[in-house]
Amino acid sequence: MSMAQGESCGADTVVADTTVVKKKTWIDKFLDYFNDANKNKKHKKFDFSIIGGPHYNSDIKFGLGLVAAGLYRTCPTDTLLPPSNVSLFSDVSTVGFYLLGIRGTNIFPQDKSRLKYTIYFFSFPSGFWGIGYDSCDNDDNGSEMKRWQARIKASYAVRLSKNLYLGPIVAYDYIHSSRVTRPELLNGQDASIWNLGLGVQLMYDSRDVLTNPHRGYYLNVEQSFRPKFLGNKYTFATTEIETSVYARPWRGAVLAYDFRTMLNFGNPSWAMMALFGSSNSMRGYYEGRYRDKHKFETQLELRQHVWKRNGVVVWGGFGTVFSKFEQLQFRRLLPNWGFGYRWEFKKNVNVRLDYGFGKPGQRGFIFNINEAF
């Protein structure tokens, strides 16, 4: 028995002596982090990851962005419930721009209601060309201002029937501008303003995935009011409509179409005008170079999966700004096109790198998370 014990100990000793646990380097841990980021983690209550990268565009020049994405289910046992999402985003650039914000959609159990929210603030030495297509299209009107802006917007929509939702919205905006080089372009309006708005939202949403749709239809109509009794100096009403449709023409491809419009009725301030260009629509334009009471934008995008977690996109579109509907003319249409790269950061959450082009001199590189629409 003692020999058996001795042999057992000897065997154990040999195993212990020959087993070497290789310690992972920080590079191994870094690669493992991104290799595992897009795996479906239904066992985790909250799946959260962070990534950063450089970018360049015509308004904030060279910058470094940091984004984080989180996925979760309000009812973990309901696998048919679409995951809720939250994104944190921050940015700094060489011209003194900085941004910090959070946005997301919380889908309540059984998808009976949805809470959508956006909170951000930024500081930016921005350009300003005035109000209206003709003024904004004139390069000689280029001026500068130091702008600090904050926004809080939230909507709570209750499901009325399959894919149909209705509910209230609230929005607060504060804009402080200083060092305005050409104040006459403000048309006598205050350089710093705030607005509080209340309204209602009607939404139809049959998209299969909110962050990276492959098929389905989306229609969102928002009607908001900023009356005087809420303390607003500039009183107006805003109608916003966005509609998108998604189809799969062949394997690995998604064809996505988007149309959106913003119509302001009343007396909106220069800071609350409809702005042309953003990271989601008319990509590549200096955001706010063109501004007026109304705008419309439309775009068609082809998204193609290439290999593993990699994909590419191309898009084209056009739009314009206007103060009266009779100003809608072909010569005032602003073209837009571009291409981009996609990397699946998390399951159905893409990091997107886009390079967009507009009129001559209007172009930009965008680093962001989730699809543009």
Regions found by a protein language model. Give the residues of each.
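Outer-membrane beta-barrel "beta-signal"
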Residues: 199-200, 339-345, 362-373
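Gram-negative/organellar outer-membrane beta-barrel architecture
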Residues: 40-50, 55-190, 194, 350-351, ...
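C-terminal outer-membrane beta-barrel translocator/porin domains of Gram-negative envelope proteins
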Residues: 198-203, 207-305
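Sec-dependent signal peptide cleavage junction
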Residues: 2-41
